[in-house]
């Protein structure tokens, strides 16, 4: 997890998701309930469209992502499908960061 400068409320909400995920996973595990979360990277949405309307800004962003591209809604959906499947039956309390390596930079 990283932080966004000058945006304390956003940062606190991200940290809250991580803490709630771990807390609920521990509390609900005894009932056989798994609790995980997805931390999406830069995914084009209506909320951030204006930020990257300039093609040069889009290129600059993609150059900072090790996989060289922004994620898609399908990338996030596939991560959620995995977490909802039996293939992840031994995962709980985890935040899966689907962000193309952004946090490695």
Q: Where do the protein language model's features map onto the residues?
A:
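Catalytic loop of short-chain dehydrogenase/reductase
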Residues: 1-16, 21-30, 43
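Short coil/turn segments at alpha/beta junctions that flank glycine-rich nucleotide-binding fingerprints
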Residues: 5-6, 30-33, 54, 63, ...
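Short, flexible catalytic-loop segment of classical short-chain dehydrogenase/reductase
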Residues: 18, 39-50
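Short-chain dehydrogenase/reductase
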Residues: 21, 77-80, 84
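Short, small/polar-rich loop/turn modules that mediate ligand/substrate recognition or access, typified
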Residues: 29, 34, 91-93, 99
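A short C-terminal helix-loop "cap" of Rossmann-like NAD(P)-dependent dehydrogenase/epimerase domains
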Residues: 49-65
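A conserved structural motif in NAD(P)-dependent oxidoreductases
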Residues: 65-76, 87
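Short hydrophobic/aromatic patches at helix-to-coil boundaries
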Residues: 102-105
